[in-house]
């Protein structure tokens, strides 16, 4: 009898836990995805802060030339970064217990792999948590779909690209100048500026900014007046009010006359879907582009594509970009190899004798 009561009590305790986890009455929704999200993101954040402040230099290229990234080793907020895991480790799973000592783990850049893998798992769970909360509230799932764009972008630069290149040392450093270095080297090795998927991403980001500014300014300019001249226009809105707070007909008429009639949305729902879809699709394409360039399917190459009747090259902007790419390539990892891959790939002329 006692055993039965104890089992029922433990079941009710588990039931209470399940109800608490999935309750939409909590100030912050946890959810089953949150059970995994919270520890992974806390781990990634904690290790990032500690490593950014105090991690020793890391042998990123695997040639016994460690690179400093932390504040206590001479960096500032701009130059500091979590240095990627050493090329000597490659794509191996490198937890602390795989190293002979903590010093060796730090020297080989173990914190980078720990942070990145926990972070990617955490943001994926955050996306799942968005879907889970939407489901509990009877909402449509598009919030999680929109968040999939930055999740895809982060996965591309932190996981897919290192897999394609064969080493976590090729992943994006976790810092400001490290991000810029990653971008410059990526351009040098993959000509990303000439990749159509990157172009779509640029159109998505800049276009999304433009459309957001246009929408916000149109709405703000066509508010229905509810206040006097001496009050803020924002005081004319009450949270949860049923009536429209701005005149969509006026906004539609203004923009239709500014550009042309069919450039202006007359349906608020389709307008807001467009505002969400444009940048999301653009960033999806950029993430896909990074993932293809990870396996060296690079941007377009129009170098020396224009010649005169004598066969002499007439330089175009593509050739100027190529010259810049070569310059960037010979300067990065300058002690790791004698020649950049593009220059070393030329066949040696055969000799007679």
Swiss-Prot record:
Residues where Phosphothreonine is found: 2
Membrane-spanning segments: 29-46, 118-133, 142-156, 197-218, 274-288
Chain residues that bind pheophytin a: 126
Site positions for Tyrosine radical intermediate: 161
Modification type N-acetylthreonine: residues: 2
Top enzyme category: oxidoreductase
Annotated binding of [CaMn4O5] cluster, by residue: 170, 189, 332-333, 342, 344
CDD domains, per database record: Photosystem-II_D1
Cofactor note: The D1/D2 heterodimer binds P680, chlorophylls that are the primary electron donor of PSII, and subsequent electron acceptors. It shares a non-heme iron and each subunit binds pheophytin, quinone, additional chlorophylls, carotenoids and lipids. D1 provides most of the ligands for the Mn4-Ca-O5 cluster of the oxygen-evolving complex (OEC). There is also a Cl(-1) ion associated with D1 and D2, which is required for oxygen evolution. The PSII complex binds additional chlorophylls, carotenoids and specific lipids.
Gene Ontology CC annotations of this record: chloroplast thylakoid membrane; photosystem II
Keywords: Acetylation, Calcium, Chlorophyll, Chloroplast, Chromophore, Electron transport, Herbicide resistance, Iron, Magnesium, Manganese, Membrane, Metal-binding, Oxidoreductase, Phosphoprotein, Photosynthesis, Photosystem II, Plastid, Thylakoid, Transmembrane, Transmembrane helix, Transport
Enzymatic reactions: 2 a plastoquinone + 4 hnu + 2 H2O = 2 a plastoquinol + O2
SUPFAM superfamilies tied to this protein: Bacterial photosystem II reaction centre, L and M subunits (SSF81483)
Alphabetical list of InterPro entries matching this protein: D1/D2 (IPR055266), Photo_II_D1/D2_sf (IPR036854), Photo_RC_L/M (IPR000484), Photo_RC_L/M_CS (IPR055265), PSII_D1 (IPR005867)
Chain positions recorded as chlorophyll a PD1 binding sites: 198
Biological processes per GO annotation: photosynthetic electron transport in photosystem II; response to herbicide
Membrane topology field: Multi-pass membrane protein
GO molecular function: chlorophyll binding; electron transporter, transferring electrons within the cyclic electron transport pathway of photosynthesis activity; iron ion binding; oxidoreductase activity, acting on diphenols and related substances as donors, oxygen as acceptor; oxygen evolving activity
Residues where chlorophyll a ChlzD1 binds: 118
Binding site for a quinone: 215, 264-265
Protein family membership: Belongs to the reaction center PufL/M/PsbA/D family.
Primary role: Photosystem II (PSII) is a light-driven water:plastoquinone oxidoreductase that uses light energy to abstract electrons from H(2)O, generating O(2) and a proton gradient subsequently used for ATP formation. It consists of a core antenna complex that captures photons, and an electron transfer chain that converts photonic excitation into a charge separation. The D1/D2 (PsbA/PsbD) reaction center heterodimer binds P680, the primary electron donor of PSII as well as several subsequent electron acceptors.
Subunit text: PSII is composed of 1 copy each of membrane proteins PsbA, PsbB, PsbC, PsbD, PsbE, PsbF, PsbH, PsbI, PsbJ, PsbK, PsbL, PsbM, PsbT, PsbX, PsbY, PsbZ, Psb30/Ycf12, at least 3 peripheral proteins of the oxygen-evolving complex and a large number of cofactors. It forms dimeric complexes.
Additional facts recorded: 2 of the reaction center chlorophylls (ChlD1 and ChlD2) are entirely coordinated by water.
The protein's name in its UniProt record: Photosystem II protein D1
Organism: Populus trichocarpa (Western balsam poplar)
Protein's gene: psbA
């Amino acid at each position: 009898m006692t055993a039965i009561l104890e089992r029922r009590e433990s079941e009710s305790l588990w039931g209470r836990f399940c109800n608490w986890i999935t309750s939409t009455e909590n100030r912050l929704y946890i959810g089953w995805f949150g059970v995994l999200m919270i520890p992974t993101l806390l781990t990634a954040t904690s290790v990032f802060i500690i490593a950014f402040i105090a991690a020793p230099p890391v042998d990123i290229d695997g040639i016994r030339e460690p690179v400093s990234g932390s504040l206590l080793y001479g960096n500032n907020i701009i130059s500091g970064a979590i240095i990627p895991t050493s090329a000597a480790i490659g794509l191996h799973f490198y937890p602390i217990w795989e190293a002979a000592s903590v010093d060796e783990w730090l020297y080989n850049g173990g914190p980078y792999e720990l942070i990145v893998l926990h972070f990617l798992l955490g943001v994926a769970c955050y996306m799942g948590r968005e879907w889970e909360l939407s489901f509990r509230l009877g909402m449509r799932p598009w919030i999680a779909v929109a968040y999939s764009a930055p999740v895809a972008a982060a996965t591309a630069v932190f996981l897919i690209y290192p897999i394609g290149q064969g080493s976590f040392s090729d992943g994006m450093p976790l810092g400001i100048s490290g991000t810029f270095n990653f971008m410059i080297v990526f351009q040098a090795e993959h000509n990303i500026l000439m990749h159509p998927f990157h172009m779509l991403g640029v159109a998505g980001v800049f276009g999304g900014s433009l459309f957001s500014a246009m929408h916000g300014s149109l709405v703000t300019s066509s508010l229905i007046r509810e206040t006097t001249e001496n009050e803020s226009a924002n005081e004319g809105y009450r949270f949860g009010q049923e009536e429209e707070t701005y005149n969509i007909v006026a906004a539609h008429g203004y923009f239709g006359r500014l550009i042309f009639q069919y450039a202006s949305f007359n349906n608020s729902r389709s307008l807001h879907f467009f505002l969400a879809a444009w940048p999301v699709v653009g960033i999806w394409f950029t993430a896909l582009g990074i993932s293809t360039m990870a396996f060296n399917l690079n941007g377009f190459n129009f170098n020396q594509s224009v010649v005169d009747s004598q066969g002499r090259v007439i330089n175009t902007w593509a050739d100027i970009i190529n010259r810049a790419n070569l310059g960037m390539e010979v300067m990065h990892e300058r002690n790791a190899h004698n020649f950049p891959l593009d220059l070393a790939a030329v066949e040696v002329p055969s000799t007679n004798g």
